[in-house]
């Protein structure tokens, strides 16, 4: 039976504090392990417990993934009767949310590397582990799901040693579902993870790990105290801006919100200062006291830049103001979300947004639609290109419609990512074929005991759309992927403009690898022909590269039978009526506008189908 106590806060000895993250691949049981730690250490009663306690968003529970990092403080009394204060952060496992992992690790001295003992090491496990090692975080390997009949903990422990290169033969074996091995895990955390360094007598230095917006309280920030002590009612300063605020409330999550009157060196907690401007407390910034400020800011986590860009437009223009405010609130607790205003002739006013990947984009879109009731159109995602012009100037662009004339461009360079793919050997042939199809170049291939680690350099534009889905398909779901930007490489790209009755539709302009241009153009033109409603005149749809039409289709006009009342008689009367109709159609085509419903754009621009 675990010897746990219920939240005896105010531990003065920093040697009793352990700050750690839980990192793992998606579906390896980290959220369930968090639930078990909370339950067994008395964080919540049996009645208050629910599956995936820390996955607070409905989207997280529906998709079965962790999107936002969540923190909890619990207290534990070990076998010697000593009280330890455990602060742990549950982190996402999907490749798109690796920035959340780096933020969590910046606040910790240790990390539990949770690996499913039925599946083994995955590519994202590898990436997160190397991130932790680079940040000098102590790694504690944990083999989860030992209650399952197909568990092979010894094999997976050897895999961890072979692939990652850290000792794992004595790794903790546990089952987050049944609670088996959890007590041993807590003892290992206490023994192996170092206590936080810092001085309670030094000027306050607090790292902002995360922030979110509360409609009633304003900005709520999750912080880690690196040095000093923070009291309620203190006057604090945001070091990057120099602005001062008074502390209204401070506290911790247990995981219930619990108010305190102070946070001490080494602790992780939340702070409310009545900040209403959502960019006034940026994630990664340092807080200090205005009276006795620290000299230097804390070196925070690695800032992540957006990898893909897409235009987001409200379906109706009256939702624009609401959309702008919603993006501002979402960007507060998502450091990687970038946005700037954009205007499209076809879609109206919206925003050009930057994301870490397609899943990240889909999550943001789903949150905007669900939490703020905004109906959106999302354009086809693109990457950022480096362009060298004839005059020697270098520019970076992510919007195809803004690309200069191809005759003014000397070189176009596209971003290349290094993809690490872990897979059982039997799927190797199919995966190599897929990588070649995506213009990949093999860098390395290493055989381990039961898996193969493939490294390929692949254009990011090929990876972001549906590479992950295709990889899962050809490997029956067993392969895992992790990728990282490496460099820009010259490529022959072409800009494809879509014209409707000779008028360019900016929202449908795309960039394509020159060998794929014909097929992509034909797909879009054929799709538009099916979706655009017929008018009283012919509608021509053209795909154009440098004023040369490479694909074309025509939507035939609706035609009234003007001869329906002519029962015989002079043929000249029929010819006159037909000529009159023909002249009318010509005039209509000159002055008539093609009505393209926004639902057509919604269907054409669907990222998965495109």
Curated annotation (Swiss-Prot):
Give the GO cellular component terms, alphabetically.
plasma membrane
Check the record and name the Pfam families matching this protein: EFG_C, GTP_EFTU, GTP_EFTU_D2, LepA_C
Write down the top EC class of this protein: hydrolase
Q: Which UniProt keywords apply?
A: Cell membrane, GTP-binding, Hydrolase, Membrane, Nucleotide-binding, Protein biosynthesis
A single Gene Ontology biological process assigned to it is: positive regulation of translation
- The EC number(s) attached to this protein equal 3.6.5.n1
Q: Which SUPFAM superfamilies match?
A: EF-G C-terminal domain-like, P-loop containing nucleoside triphosphate hydrolases
Q: Which Gene3D superfamilies match?
A: 3.30.70.240, Elongation factor 4, C-terminal domain, Elongation Factor G (Translational Gtpase), domain 3, P-loop containing nucleotide triphosphate hydrolases, Translation factors
Please state which protein family the record places this protein in: Belongs to the TRAFAC class translation factor GTPase superfamily. Classic translation factor GTPase family. LepA subfamily.
> What protein is this chain from?
Elongation factor 4
Which organism is this protein's natural source? Buchnera aphidicola subsp. Acyrthosiphon pisum (strain Tuc7)
